[in-house]
Amino acid sequence: MDSFVLDAQNPNPKNLKNLLKYEEQLERQHVSLDNILGALDVRNHSLGQLLVLKAKGSDQGKNRSVFIDQCNNFFRNCNVEQVRLAPAQLSQLSKFYTEALYELKQPIRGVAVLKDALNILSDNKPTTTLTPIHTDFLQLCILSKCYHQALPLIESNITHINPEQSSIAIKDILCYFYYSGIIFTAFKKYKKAIEAFKFVITAPASALSAITVEAYKKYLIVYLIQFGSVQHFPKCTPAVVQRNIKSHCKPYTEFVQSFSNGNINDIMNKASSGAEFFQKDSNWGLVKLSIKSTYRRNIKKLTQTFMTLSINDIAEKVSLPKAKAEQFVLKMIEEGEIFATINQKDGMVTFDECFEDFSGPTILNDLDRNINNIVGLESKIKEMDEKISLSNNYLKKLASGKNTGQLSQYEDPMEDIS
C-alpha cells in the first residue's frame, strides 16, 4: 500500500479525490491498517486517514478500544476541507464509531466528540442542516442518557438537507426524528415528541419500515399520556402505512381502545395482557405513565365539577386507595396542574381558580421569541417554495402533468426533487 500512502501525502486536491479508488484494497488489508495510519498525519492527510479508519471499522476482529481512540483523534483534529470530499465515507465511519462505543458499553465517550463533529458536514450550521452524524450523535445521547446534550439541537428548526454534501439517506432522517421523539419524551415534552414521531409516520413511503413501526408504537402511548385518547392516523400518513402497520402493533391498538370508555379496570387489564410486548419494546415505562395520566386527568375533571371534596371522595371517584389519591393531588398541586389546598385536619380538598398571570416579562419574552421563530420559518418556506417552483425537475413534472392530465395534487410535483 505504498502507493496509497504516497498519494495520501500529496497535497494536490485532485490527487486527494483519486484516493477513493483504494477503498476496496484497504478493506483487504486489515492487518496492515494501523501501520498505514501511523504513516499519515491526521491534520495534513485527513482524507487518507478517513479511508483507513473506515476500512478498519468494517473489521469485526479489530481492537475496539484502540479504534475508538483513533477515531477520537481523527474527529477532533481532521482537516474539514479534505474530509468533505468523501461525505459517504465519513458518515460510514461515524456509524462504525457509534457501533464500537455501543459494543463496549461506553457511549458517553463519544457524545462530546460527535457533538463537535456535527459541524463537518453541515457547513458549521449544525442546528439548521441535518447530516448522518446528527443521527449517530442522538443515538449516543440516548444510550448514555445524556439527553440534555441533545436538547438544544433537536429544539432547533432543521431547514436544510443536502444529500450531495452530506450523503444523508432517508433512514438517517427517519432515525433522527425517531430519536428526537425519544429525547423529548424523556423531558416530558410530549407535544414535541408527538410531532417528531408523527414526522416518521407520515414520511413518504412505498413500503412499511421497522423505524415507522417503532415510531408508531411510541406515538400511540405518548399521545395517550398527553391527550388521553387517539382518534385517527395523522394527516398525510401514506396508504401503505395505514394498511399494514396495525398488524404489527396489535397490543398497542388494543390498549388505546381501552381508553375510549375511561374504565380504569379495562385499561389495567389491557396493560397486563400486553405487558410482555411493551417490555420487549422498552415501552413499559410509557404505558405506566399513560395509566397515571388517566388518574391525573380524572382528578382534574373533578375540579371542573366540585369546589370541595374529601380525599376519600376523590379516591372513590378515581378508583384509587386514599393514600395514593392524596399523593396524586399533592403532586398535581406541586406541578401546577391543579390549584387546590388540602386541610390536613378534616382531609378536605378545596379547588381554587387558576392564578396564572400571563402579563409578566417571561410570557412576553416567550411570545416575542415564538413570533420571531414563525417569521423566520415563513421566510424560509417562501425561499424553499421559490426554489422548487423554478427547479427543472418540477417544471418538467408540471409540463408532463398538463400534457397527460394526470398530475398528482401532492406527490408528483415533489417526486425526485433534491
UniProtKB/Swiss-Prot annotation:
Annotated Gene Ontology cellular component terms: COP9 signalosome; cytoplasm
Cited Gene3D superfamilies: Winged helix-like DNA-binding domain superfamily/Winged helix DNA-binding domain (1.10.10.10)
PCI domain sequence ranges: 186-356
Matching Pfam families: COP9_hel_rpt, PCI
Principal location class: cytoplasm
Subcellular location, record wording: Cytoplasm; Nucleus
Keyword Cytoplasm applies: yes
Keywords: Cytoplasm, Nucleus, Signalosome
GO terms under biological process: ubiquitin-dependent protein catabolic process
Keyword Nucleus annotated: yes
Coiled coil regions in record: none
Protein family according to the UniProt entry: Belongs to the CSN3 family.
Primary role: Component of the COP9 signalosome complex (CSN), a complex involved in various cellular and developmental processes. The CSN complex is an essential regulator of the ubiquitin (Ubl) conjugation pathway by mediating the deneddylation of the cullin subunits of E3 ligase complexes, leading to modify the Ubl ligase activity.
Assembly and oligomerization: Component of the CSN complex. The holocomplex is comprised of 8 subunits csn1-8. In the complex, it probably interacts directly with csn2 and csn5.
Annotated protein name in UniProt: COP9 signalosome complex subunit 3
